[in-house]
């Protein structure tokens, strides 16, 4: 697999939601992408993933077994997180946050984690299932410019910008859902500024956007 392997000896590895991206390198199906992404899994190292489409998840699990990862775990959404106001908008971020918590939990409970950060498991409350206070603060204050970002209107322009760097069919759908929620009470005219970089299909991205707008009963 052609995966990004910056850390040669990881303590734990994780894969977030898969989508069709960089298809010239990663492949043209979700299963091919999963195989390439699974390249970060290492022998004797726990392998984690968010819930994926069935076929893609099977590929991840197969690769984890092939390289003899110490375990393969599918991390569901942590229900306790649903009461946390995440800094990054979007329902999918609860899945990402759940994976992040499990990665941290696995790390601090490992031999390496205990050696480098003694007492961290107690401070972070990693022995329980609830979300520790420190994690709540971190997740609620997280900010990623260009991801579901709102730039408020200035008096001179009278225009509020809703920015997102979605570049896959899946992330475009999530972007539309976020935008519709954010502007539900805003009856002002809306203008779409769309940019597509080389190597991606503007047709499929825009088609996905229009489909989602129709589902949300928004005229486009």
Labelled PLM ranges:
Residues 2-14, 18-22, 32, 81-219:
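Nucleotide phosphate-binding/pyrophosphate-handling subdomain across enzymes
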């Amino acid at each position: 697999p052609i995966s990004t392997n910056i850390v040669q000896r990881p303590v734990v590895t994780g894969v977030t939601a898969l989508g069709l991206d960089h298809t010239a390198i990663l492949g043209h199906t979700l299963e091919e992408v999963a195989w390439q992404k699974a390249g970060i899994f290492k022998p004797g190292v726990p392998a984690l993933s968010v819930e994926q489409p069935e076929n893609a998840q099977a590929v991840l699990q197969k690769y984890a077994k092939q390289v003899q990862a110490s375990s393969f775990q599918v991390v569901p959404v942590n229900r306790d997180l649903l009461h946390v106001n995440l800094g990054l908008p979007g329902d999918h971020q609860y899945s990402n946050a759940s994976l992040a918590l499990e990665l941290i939990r696995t790390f601090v409970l490992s031999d390496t984690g205990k050696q480098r950060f003694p007492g961290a498991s107690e401070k972070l409350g990693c022995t329980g299932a609830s979300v520790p206070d420190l994690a709540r603060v971190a997740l609620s204050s997280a900010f990623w410019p260009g991801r579901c970002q709102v730039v408020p209107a200035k008096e001179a322009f009278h225009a509020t910008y809703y920015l997102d760097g979605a570049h896959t069919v899946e992330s475009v759908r999530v972007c539309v859902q976020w935008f519709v929620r954010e502007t539900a009470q805003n009856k002002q005219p809306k203008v779409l500024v769309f940019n597509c970089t080389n190597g991606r299909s503007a047709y499929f991205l825009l088609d996905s956007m229009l489909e989602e707008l129709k589902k949300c009963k928004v005229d486009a």
